Design a protein with these regions (language model features):
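C-terminal structured "cap/appendage" subdomains that terminate the fold
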Residues: 51-124
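An acidic, gly/pro-interrupted, aromatic-rich
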Residues: 1-61, 109-140
Length: 140
């Protein structure tokens, strides 16, 4: 059995050894990364770590998460692109707590306790952006 998300990324069957994998970039891969509960849960986990381990400002948290994912700090234009996203999603989830609850119940692992749900949901979206950057997905 090969998980459907692995099929989207051209994973070989596990029945035999494969020394070289083909590389592709197709729209279905983006859909998997954005919609598969596994990847949403991974983003939520990164968001939880960001909020728990970085007690600074929103800008400092973006920089911390960026460094965790990409091993570098964001450039000025990248920070300028992400900060409105942080504010927009935070306002949205503070206004609609039910939407935050819906997002945070995705996956098997429970959300971290002691973190504001609206904040965790907003930072989950920021983490999804970081985890879906071309630079994150591709090695070269």
């Amino acid at each position: 059995f090969l998980h459907p998300s692995m099929l989207a990324f051209d994973a070989p069957s596990r029945e035999e050894c494969c020394a070289d994998r083909s590389r592709s970039n197709i729209p279905q891969q983006a859909l998997v990364l954005l919609n598969d509960p596994t990847y949403v849960e991974a983003a939520r986990s990164l968001a939880g770590r960001t909020l728990a381990e970085c007690q600074g400002s929103a800008e400092e948290r973006v920089a911390w998460a960026w460094r965790q994912v990409l091993q570098r700090l964001p450039r000025v234009e990248e920070m300028e692109a992400v900060m409105p996203l942080v504010r927009e999603h935070l306002a949205h989830y503070r206004a609609t707590p039910a939407a935050a609850d819906e997002l945070l119940k995705t996956g098997y692992a429970p959300p971290p306790s002691g973190i504001d749900k609206a904040e965790l949901a907003a930072w989950t979206h920021v983490a999804r952006v970081l985890l879906n950057l071309h630079e994150t997905i591709t090695r070269n």
